[in-house]
Amino acid sequence: LDVATGAGHTAAYLAERGVAVTAADISEGMLEEARKLAVERGLDISTRQHAAESLPYADTSFRLVTCRVAAHHFASVEDFLREAFRVLHPGGLLLVIDGASPEGAPVAEKWLQGVEKLRDPSHGRFLRPSEWGQLVQEMGFKVLRSECFPFKQPDLEWYFRTAGTSEANRSEVRGMVAQAPAEARRVLGLAEEEGKTVWWWPRLTLLARRPEVAKSAAQT
């Protein structure tokens, strides 16, 4: 199950490797893009429209739940994780990839959250890696791997295009970049390169397993 599949790239990657995939998204428009991608690549991918926080599947329906670069939009990450645990078969895996907030850098975190909210008003919040670890364990998962990799934001115009940012919000972001605090510049590597504004996002990759026998937070 690929939750918040968007244009379906993760679902397609898995299907190309022989995995039976259900691609799910709250947006019918995104599901249509995922279907187009599947047709282009000759892949058999099922699609379902629903929110991440309420999965319309029976318990233990899947052996893998994935969610790539989407969880920061969710109304409740806790509900998503609780539902992911429920629909996973015991021993099943959860893979989450998403932007993250830097640890121990509250000024940089506030700047990053503010910039992202202006770029894309549907943004909720980037969690810190430690918050992710705590939440998945509270829901009953065992963390197998949790790593942050730097992802380069190559230029402001690219950043705006990917979200269709309004002109008014673009102007506000440029102002925040110009007045960025020293901690944000240092922690995020905010700089000018060949006339382009760049910085480095923390991107979390988290792999967790539903134990063979365990109680979830929803069952306690």
What are the residue ranges of the model-derived segments?
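Class I SAM-dependent methyltransferase SAM/SAH-binding core
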Residues: L1-V3, A7-S54
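Conserved acidic residues
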Residues: R63
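A conserved beta-strand element that flanks and buttresses the S-adenosyl-L-methionine
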Residues: T66
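A short His-aromatic
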Residues: H72-H73
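Conserved class I S-adenosyl-L-methionine
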Residues: L95-L118
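Short alpha-helix
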Residues: R125-M139
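Conserved Class I S-adenosyl-L-methionine
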Residues: R145-T220
